[in-house]
Structures are given as structure tokens and as C-alpha cells.
Amino acid sequence: PPPLQQPSVCFLRLRIPHIELLSWLKQLQVKLHNPPTINYPASQGQMDICITSGSQDGLCKVFEMMVNPGDNVLLNEPVYSGTLQALKPLGCNIITVASDEYGIIPNSLKEVLSKWKPENSKNPKKNTPKFLYTVPNGNNPTGTSLTSNRKEEIYELARKYDFLIIEDDPYYFLQFSKSWAPTFLSMDIDGRVIRADSFSKILSSGLRIGFLTGPKPLIERVVLHTQVSTVHSSTFTQLLISQLLHQWGEEGFLAHVERVTDFYRNQKDALLAAADKWLSGLAEWHVPTAGMFLWVKIKGISDVKQLIEEKAVKKEILMLPGSVFYIDSSAPSPYFRASFSSASPEQMDIAFQRLAQLIKESL
């Protein structure tokens, strides 16, 4: 019989996560991040992995497990709107930390944390922050990435004030620098980092398979959450991905990732060329270091919402106003997010040419 027939039948009947896929992913995480907790006892935060129905599914389960009404959580604005939509219904207090073109500003985080004493973390009544959520590479929407030094400072603050770090890193494999930045997972000596990875940006978003890496006690609870909610991620897509990864091997997988990154790097260069050509003097931006987004500030217009959502759409330009990435989405914002994931260089050029004309008409 064909080689997939017997394993696939057994696999679909058992309806459990594919053990071979979990094993492959664990080896990959060790190769890429070398987590200090890999050989820890389970009670001390030993690294573990579970498969989720996309990284967003895993993150939502973590939020639901950890957050109670009135809890304090930390994140930097602007932030992925899906994260805000997942956190707001839980009734937590979202405390924002300032960021710039290099990600979260450690001094801003220190200032926020100065409201508490480090020993307050041992007293539940003091309500110290439970976790810091961050997208460290190619942040959506800004395209910025945290520097290694800032990550180290942030991790030390997490140790000092005893909060967890949720490292949402779907664009990790789309870093444009040849040397990938060290991750929070790679420096986690305490078992306080929960890392979310995704296949959506490097294989297909429709597969809806991601994976969480973190301390075993927390990962086991995510698995329990899955068993009583989504039951399990699609066994069929798990099998497809597992067969593909095992056929590629680690070297083949990383070669595929490099080809995908080359594509996005070329897309980024094309969008920047169009921006330089048409938006110079009208807007400003920082060059993204990873991911698929450009964060643009239009000069002289305090709120671009109508320009982007109405006027631009009529000209067949599809972008998002910056306001949707803030807790108060009704507040005016001069920013918009452009994506270079799928448009051709010619389409990017035409879009920014039309946008430039709209900006001039609005000034």
C-alpha cells in the first residue's frame, strides 16, 4: 500500500497530537533556541511543547487560563488588534509600555513597574502585572524588532518583578538579517517564557497549525483546555505538516524558510522603493527588520481614518488606519499600516502614487 495509508488511518482513529510532529518541533526549538530549561525537572519549568489550531488559538487559551477580571497585564502600543480583542472581554487592566523603532523601551517598562516593589509579587493583593505580551520580531503593525540588549533588560525586569513573558513570534522566520536575533526562550533560565510559533506565515495560514513552547506545568494546562474546547487540532493537517517536515529534514525546512524570507525581503524593498518615490516629504517611516508590514506616519494630518478607510478604498488602495491598533480605537492617529505580503511591485507603486495624490488633496 502507499506509505501514508496505514499511518494516516491509525492517526485519524486515535485523534491525538501527532507524536512524530511534536518530537520534530521539540528538536527544532532546541536547535534554534537551546532553551536553558530543556533538562529542568518538570516542577521547575522544564520546556514542553503542545500543538494548537494556529498560534492565535494557543494565545487565546493562555489568556483565558491566566487572566482574571481586574488583573494587570503589560503590552506595548501599537499592538496587533487580535490581541486586544482577545484580552478586552476578560476584564483585565491593560497597561501600555512605550516603544520605538527598536521595540519596547526598557526605561518605560521600568517606570511602569516602579509603581510596585519587587517583593509585592508575593502578595496577591498588590496585583502586580501577571505577564508582558510582546511580538519581538516584525511587530504587527510597526515592523519593528526588539534588540538583543533590550530583551536581556526586559527579561531581568521580569525576574525582578516576577511576571511571565508571552513571546508571540509569528514572524521569527521572516527576519531580514541573516543572523537571527536571540529569543526570550533562549535566555529563559526560570521557566517564565511562553512562546507562540506559527506555520501560517511560512507554509499556509489556512492550515491553522501553531505550537506553544513553555514551562511544562503551563503547557499541560493548555492541553487540558484544548481537550474541553477544541478537543484537538486537525489531525489531518498535523499529519500533512509532519510528513512534509520529515521529508525536508531540518536543513530542508530552513532552506524553505530562507526562500520565503527572500521573497518577503524583495517585497519589502519594492514597497520601500515606492514609498521613497511617492511619499517622501508627505510621510515618514522606519525600515522594517522582519515580517510583512510598513508603519507610516502621514505629516500634517492628525487623523487618517477617513483618508484610509474611505478615500483610499475608492481608489482601490487597501490599508489599515493606525487607530485599530490602539486600546482606544476612537482616538485620532496619523499612522497607517501597509502590507507587502501579496501585492506586486507594480501594484505597490500605483497604490502609493494614488495615495500621495490623496494626501496632497487632504492637506
Segments and roles (model prediction):
Residues 189-265:
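Conserved core segment of the aminotransferase class I/II
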Residues 6-161, 166, 172-190, 194, ...:
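Conserved core of the PLP fold type I
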Residues 314-315, 329-363:
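PLP-dependent enzyme catalytic core of the Aspartate aminotransferase-like
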Residues 213, 295-297, 339-341:
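Short hydrophobic/aromatic beta-strand micro-patches
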Residues 1-6, 114, 314, 360:
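Conserved N-terminal helix/loop that builds the PLP phosphate-binding region
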